[in-house]
Amino acid sequence: MAQEKMELDLEPDTSYGGTLRRSSSAPLIHGLSDLSQVFQPYTLRTRRNSTTIMSRHSLEEGLDMVNRETAHEREMQTAMQISQSWDESLSLSDSDFDKPEKLYSPKRIDFTPVSPAPSPTRGFGKMFVSSSGLPPSPVPSPRRFSRRSQSPVKCIRPSVLGPLKRKGEMETESQPKRLFQGTTNMLSPDAAQLSDLSSCSDILDGSSSSSGLSSDPLAKGSATAESPVACSNSCSSFILMDDLSPK
């Protein structure tokens, strides 16, 4: 019964112009012909931007490599220059040690003090350094004046106030001391004159008493012998008094 139903469905119907009737199992297809392609051919889709992205990546990598190479070359050149400069400086220093040092070499520096004997109070003298290497000239330039510091002994001046007296010091100590104060000759002139006068008066009194009382010629002779000495002393004392009296 089922097969008969299928056959009835497949029979062409003249009323619809020979078009196939849709069966329950077949899909609906409109305008189907022999030239019409049931399956569409597969079109190859090219990946967009795939080649451009790869080319860009390759270009960027190439530029990075070039930049890295140039930077590496620059670093190598700078390292070579630094090594050459170090080698040259070392060779120059070795040659300077080997050869005797010249006067005009800039490495020579002369440290010479201004004064041959620096003062003890101000420390060392000033140091002149010649940048050109030449020793400083002994004759000072007119702009620079080198002044030696005076010694502290010469700088000490006497006090204006003079010597001060200590406490308890007597004014008589300023006078020169006398070694022999017991004798009458070292006393003051007034005291000496008074002592001379007293001695003369004593001698005169003794001579008069001896001449009046004693009758011995020896006593008279001694009195007469002593009298001119006493007179001479008295005369000298009188002369001194006359000289000292105001005129």
From Swiss-Prot:
Range of residues in the leader sequence: none
Instruction: Provide ranges: composition bias, Low complexity.
Output: 83-94, 202-216
Q: Does the keyword Signal apply?
A: no
- Phosphothreonine modification sites are T112
Presence of the UniProt keyword Phosphoprotein in the record: yes
A molecular-function term among this protein's GO annotations: protein serine/threonine phosphatase inhibitor activity
InterPro entries linked: PBIR1/2/3 (IPR026716)
Q: Where in the sequence is N-acetylalanine found?
A: A2
Basic and acidic residues: bias regions: 166-176
Q: Where does the record place the modification Omega-N-methylarginine?
A: R122
- Where are the Phosphoserine residues found in this chain? S25, S33, S50, S58, S115, S119, S137, S141
Alphabetically list the UniProt keywords.
Answer: Acetylation, Methylation, Phosphoprotein
Q: Where is this region: Disordered?
A: 1-23, 82-104, 129-152, 158-177, 202-230
Q: Which residues form a coiled coil?
A: none
Similarity section? Belongs to the FAM122 family.
Q: What is this protein called?
A: PABIR family member 2
Organism from which the protein derives: Homo sapiens (Human)
* Gene designation: PABIR2
